[in-house]
Amino acid sequence: MSHKDRRGNSSNDGSSFKLNETFTSSEVEVKPTFESMGLREELLRGIFNYGFEKPSAIQQRAILPIIKGRDTIAQAQSGTGKTATFSIGALQCVEVNVRSPQVLILSPTRELAQQIQKVALALSEFMNIQVHACVGGKNLSDDVKKLETGVHIVSGTPGRVLDMITRKSLPTRHIKMMILDEADEMLSLGFQQQINDVYRYLPNGTQIVLVSATLTQDVVSMTEKFMTKPVRILLKRDELTLDGIKQFFVSVEKEDWKFGTLCDIYDSLTITQAVIFCNTKKKVDQLTEQMRDANFTVASMHGDMVQKEREEIIKSFRSGENRVLITTDILARGIDVQQVSLVINYDLPIDRENYIHRIGRSGRFGRKGVAINFVKNSDIRILRDIEQFYSTQIDEMPVNFASII
């Protein structure tokens, strides 16, 4: 056995850290440009072709440790460029002439796994690299066929990836890196055992990259199991709310008043695109029906819809065909919709840690955005808790809000 025992033990030589530690390892270099990272020429072309000019804060710090083969913990939330961070790191390490999976990326939802595939394919446009999305809701035989042709990177959900590995359709002997994206969400959804099982199939010494918006105790425990002397790139909590996003709340005395408030906001804004979050599938359906009855054009999406339908809805929203999308937290994790300028929390998130994921839909990469929270009298305590948790201030929305957005 090497330093990483397939039973899930790791002799990490004091590299574990406490939950409240929020620092970046002193060894982390800041690379101000992509050119200074020593990346392949064809990968650089893909990066610039994708529209990146200057690396974001997380990219400046995390790409180098990843391409140097270090186990890496990156605390980063939606809108920071984290997907491109680990995608660039993975693409730099792939040997193009080895037509077998070399990088495995696990994420909590099908949509996120497919989004990661799209980003990796776009960045590798000039590299002749095959990236496959291995997710549930699709025909097993399609996965088997694609994997048989030889792919370099697999982006998938833990259940389907484990299924493919146990069927011997996804060979693991050449895997050199496993990336765990949205690790906090994967654990909260109960994927811990499946991730452990996938890990046991990997070669000894596989590099682990873990990305998480929040470092819960479960995430910290996972790093201690899987990682050896990880490089840590951690942000202080008060840096977690994205710059450039104005946050407001609107007092609505009771639930019945929310709809009228939403209609008022809809009328007074020239919105590029907006996402409206509700806490339940039932509420999404009810609100969608109400909005359509009032002659507003809206789309809606939640987890009860079949995969194909969800993909069509995201596609039409991305293309701008639908301006307003009503959804549950299924969209709050990493679906990159560039034009979103407004997020409305019709319901405050049940889990305060989801607040950052929801408002991260707007203002991506420096684009300005607005988050509006509907707050019933009984929600005031939750709002204050969110403010305290993120060391941020959420102001009451002024009467002339349309002019300051």
From Swiss-Prot:
Transmembrane segments: none annotated. The keyword Nucleotide-binding applies. Pfam families: DEAD, Helicase_C. GO terms for cellular component: catalytic step 2 spliceosome; cytoplasm; nucleolus. Its main location: cytoplasm. It catalyses: ATP + H2O = ADP + phosphate + H(+). Its EC number is 3.6.4.13. The keyword Hydrolase applies. This is Eukaryotic initiation factor 4A. It comes from Dictyostelium discoideum (Social amoeba). The gene is tifA.
